């Protein structure tokens, strides 16, 4: 049984989240694992690196409502009836090998473009991870492209899933990441221009032609953050001035280093997360582990400070 080896085109910075996921795999007993985080934070990389060298891993992308049929076809199965027997055989082999995981691992990767199929993902994961009637189990890891997709997952309540959140880079991670791309000395200029999101830093490294590239990138990022904050404030009106209420609460709590509780607005976090996903104005995120709203980045927090300081406040505490 071949160990899983992710295809990586560039050097990867080791991150604490890799080890956290590895420990989950090593000590797994039941229930699905959900990996979420801001778009471009490196969720897929985190999952794949945590699984590097692990045996019994299968990765499948959820692209439409027919994803299960495609999964069975890729596994060489005529249908779901054969799945349990295959899992039994794989589990028996894994127990003999004594590797990190004693059960098969199925990774379900959900791209941002996926619009359907989450209900069947939830039931599939519950069946494989938590169903006591199964002769064999499988550890299902769901890598969700957005908080909305992670929150749409429901395998029987929070007690039947374990959530992990992939943050943006820390200072040390960003420094190492940029050093690997030839920017050890000017790494601070990169994060000042781009922030700490892995995708932004990676793309800017690819485009870099000198200091002017960073100046142009900073201007572009500032404009984008301002636009996203304005759109969220003015257009997110799920239940009253939803967007504005969330932004005001975030600013009020910013100095204390806290996010905004879901009760700062009458709208549910799930509805807000879906609105953000559908509209594409990612100024705010719902953190699925800390269970709070947060600014997507310091750029968005700074833009919100400037925009709201001239706007009358109408904060509420909703029941």
Which sequence ranges carry the predicted segments?
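C-terminal leucine-rich, beta-strand-based interaction scaffolds used for sensing/assembly
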Residues: 222-319
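A short, basic N-terminal segment
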Residues: 1-33, 148, 280-283, 290, ...
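Residue-level preference for the first positions of well-ordered beta-strands
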Residues: 30-34, 56-57, 103-107, 139
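Conserved Walker B catalytic segment
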Residues: 90-159, 170
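Walker A/P-loop nucleotide-binding motif
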Residues: 28-49
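Conserved NTP-binding/hydrolysis module of P-loop NTPases
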Residues: 52-56, 64-96
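Amphipathic alpha-helical "lid/sensor" segments that cap RecA-like P-loop NTPase cores
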Residues: 171, 180-245, 269
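Conserved AAA+ ATPase "SRH/arginine-finger" region at the nucleotide-binding site
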Residues: 162-174, 181
């Amino acid at each position: 049984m071949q160990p899983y080896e992710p295809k990586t085109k560039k050097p990867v910075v080791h991150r604490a989240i890799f080890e956290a996921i590895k420990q989950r795999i090593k000590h797994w007993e039941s229930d699905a694992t959900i990996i979420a985080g801001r778009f471009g934070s490196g969720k897929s990389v985190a999952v794949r690196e945590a699984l590097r060298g692990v045996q019994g891993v299968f990765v499948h992308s959820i692209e439409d409502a027919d994803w299960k049929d495609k999964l069975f076809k890729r596994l060489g199965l005529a249908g779901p009836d054969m799945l349990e027997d295959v899992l039994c055989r794989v589990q028996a082999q894994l127990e003999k090998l004594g590797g990190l995981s004693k059960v098969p691992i199925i990774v379900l990767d959900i791209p941002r473009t996926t619009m359907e199929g989450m209900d069947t993902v939830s039931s599939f994961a519950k069946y494989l991870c938590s169903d006591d009637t199964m002769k064999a189990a499988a550890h299902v890891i769901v890598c969700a492209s957005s908080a909305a997709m992670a929150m749409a997952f429901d395998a029987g309540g929070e007690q039947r899933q374990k959530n992990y959140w992939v943050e943006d880079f820390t200072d040390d991670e960003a420094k190492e990441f940029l050093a690997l791309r030839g920017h050890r000395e000017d790494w601070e200029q990169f994060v000042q221009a781009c922030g700490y999101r892995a995708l932004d830093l990676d793309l800017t490294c690819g485009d870099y032609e000198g200091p002017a590239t960073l100046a142009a990138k900073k201007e572009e990022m500032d404009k984008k953050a301002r636009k996203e904050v304005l759109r969220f404030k003015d257009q997110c009106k799920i239940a009253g001035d939803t967007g504005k209420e969330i932004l005001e609460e975030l600013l009020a709590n910013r100095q204390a280093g806290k996010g905004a509780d879901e009760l700062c607005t009458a709208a549910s976090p799930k509805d807000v997360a879906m609105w953000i996903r559908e509209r594409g104005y990612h100024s705010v995120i719902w953190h699925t582990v800390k269970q709070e709203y947060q600014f997507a980045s310091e750029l968005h927090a700074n833009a919100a400070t400037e925009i709201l300081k001239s706007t009358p406040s109408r904060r509420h505490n909703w029941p």
